[in-house]
Amino acid sequence: AVLSSVGILIFAHYIGDATDLTLSERRDAFKGVLIFTSVFVAAIGILVFFFLDKNGEPDTSTDVSQVFVWSDFMKVMNMPSVWYLTMIVFCAYMGYKVTDIFSLYAKEVMLYDEISAAGIGSILLYLRPLVGVIIGLLADRTQGSFLILLAFIMMFLGSIFFASGIINPGLNSLFFIGITLSAVGIYALRALYFSILKEGLIPVTLTGTAVGVISFIAYTPDIFSGPIIGYLLDSAPGGAGYRSVFSLLAVFSLLGLVATWAFRKSVSSIHQ
């Protein structure tokens, strides 16, 4: 979040108050941000190289408990809660990928300038850890799956705000309500979904295998979400493309709600 804020300041320094920049001027401004980011990352690498503890000897012994066991894998594959949780994470991660376009929406639909639009993305980066801490505290006092239900409802309401087309230039209050609902719901899901492994009655000894199976499937939006979102935006330029993207997000919100409800029902039936 701090790094993004500094990047915005550098970008603003290069473009100043100009609103009609040439491609060359925009390239120079972006180059300044890239140089800063590259230097920062290189500096971190140098610090890690010199100050990371090198005295610890690597453990070359093989612990039998760490060896992949096919029977454990099959146990995980036969757990309904694992598949419900996979769907929950999949839908939540689709929501997370959509947060990448909020800044673009601010620029192309709300007609913000480049600096203000980038600032939206920076605000979201500050919001993410704040939501994570608050949701973590709440999760200690109630069932995580209940909070996930609420988070999917928030994600759905936020996506409907954008998909309905009621958010137009000048309606900043509606824009921020839509962003807040969507982002809080999405970031809450990111903080919660693996916290319900215990609630799903997945044994601690199988946690690693379960997380591996869930992650292998549920994080596949990294592969196809970008092309899908890009296609929807390109096929209908302007607000129509964004309405299509947020309509898709609404669908995944409902699927996540159904998966969470099924997860809770499955767990409660086992308890009975």
Regions found by a protein language model. Give the residues of each.
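C-terminal transmembrane helical hairpin of 12-TM major facilitator-type secondary transporters
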Residues: Q143-I196
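Juxtamembrane intracellular "pre-TM" segments in multi-pass secondary transporters
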Residues: N55-L85
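C-terminal membrane-cytosol helix-exit motif in multi-pass small-molecule transporters
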Residues: G7-A12, G16, S38-D59, A259-F263
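A membrane-interface helix-boundary motif in multi-pass transporters
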Residues: G16-S38, Y231-S253
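Helix-to-loop junctions at the C-terminal end of transmembrane segments
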Residues: V131-Q143, L233-D234
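Glycine-rich segments within core transmembrane alpha-helices of 12-TM secondary carriers
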Residues: A1-A12, S215-S225
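Extracytoplasmic gate region of multi-pass secondary transporters
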Residues: I8, P80-L125, P129-G132, R190, ...
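A late C-terminal transmembrane helix in Major Facilitator Superfamily
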Residues: L201-P237
